[in-house]
Amino acid sequence: MDAREIIEMIAKAKKKTPIVAYIKGDLAGIDFSSFKFFGDERFGILFGEYEDFKKLLEEHREKIEDYHLEVKARNSALPLADLTKYKARIEPGAIIRDMVEIGEGAVIMMGAVINVGAVIGEGTMIDMNAVVGGRAIIGKKCHIGAGAVIAGVIEPPSAKPVVIEDEVLVGANAVILEGVTVGKGAVVAAGAVVTKDVPPYTVVAGVPARVIKQIDEKTKEKTKIVDELRNLE
């Protein structure tokens, strides 16, 4: 997605504070039409907006004996993605915004965060606690290591997004800065900070990252993608 489209969408979106409320009391006769309600005349679970619940509480405080409130977000502009639409393995605890593209056979591990407008290619693994920023483009059969950061570029809107081409391995805790392109088959060493484009089939390391060698057979073997981990059967 174009950055200005995302910015306009966020600016115009109705901000939401979604809640889940567990309430106990004399619930007969209370209008729950503003919520999705599950329960009976003594106990109920409400899914809805905080302001609606606040109003309900003020109007019926004498009837509600007790409640527990879970606030899921505050003035949120964008929902999380519907995970059922992806043909991918998405583990518990991954946070994926709406309007993210994820290719078939991709793997999103626990704690990974993927922001709006990002594209994840087929068979790519986003490892634990990695962050993929807004509009970042990651190709097919890549591995983004645990704790790595792929910078997002929604603000400023003129910035070029990160592009990671096919079959790239990004090591744990590496950082790819805004506007960088990592060429096909490249390897970014753990902890590297990549500030400029990486040529295809090279290994970069250090802060800032520099080319230390060309990809050889030994490196290919050490960084090989395991197809069995992408199996969805």
Swiss-Prot record:
Pfam families: DapH_N (PF08503), Hexapep (PF00132), Hexapep_2 (PF14602)
Enzyme class: transferase
Reaction catalysed by this enzyme: (S)-2,3,4,5-tetrahydrodipicolinate + acetyl-CoA + H2O = L-2-acetamido-6-oxoheptanedioate + CoA
Statement: the UniProt record of this protein carries the keyword Transferase: yes
GO terms under biological process: diaminopimelate biosynthetic process; lysine biosynthetic process via diaminopimelate
InterPro entries: DapH, DapH_N, Hexapep, Hexapep_transf_CS, Trans_hexapeptide_repeat, Trimer_LpxA-like_sf
EC number annotated for this UniProt entry: 2.3.1.89
UniProt keyword annotations, A-Z: Acyltransferase, Amino-acid biosynthesis, Diaminopimelate biosynthesis, Lysine biosynthesis, Repeat, Transferase
Pathway entry: Amino-acid biosynthesis; L-lysine biosynthesis via DAP pathway; LL-2,6-diaminopimelate from (S)-tetrahydrodipicolinate (acetylase route): step 1/3
Cell inner membrane in keyword set: no
PROSITE patterns: HEXAPEP_TRANSFERASES
GO molecular function, one term: tetrahydrodipicolinate N-acetyltransferase activity
Similarity section: Belongs to the transferase hexapeptide repeat family. DapH subfamily.
Function: Catalyzes the transfer of an acetyl group from acetyl-CoA to tetrahydrodipicolinate.
PANTHER family: 2,3,4,5-TETRAHYDROPYRIDINE-2,6-DICARBOXYLATE N-ACETYLTRANSFERASE, ACETYLTRANSFERASE
Listed name of the protein: 2,3,4,5-tetrahydropyridine-2,6-dicarboxylate N-acetyltransferase
Lineage: Bacteria, Thermotogati, Thermotogota, Thermotogae, Thermotogales
Gene: dapH
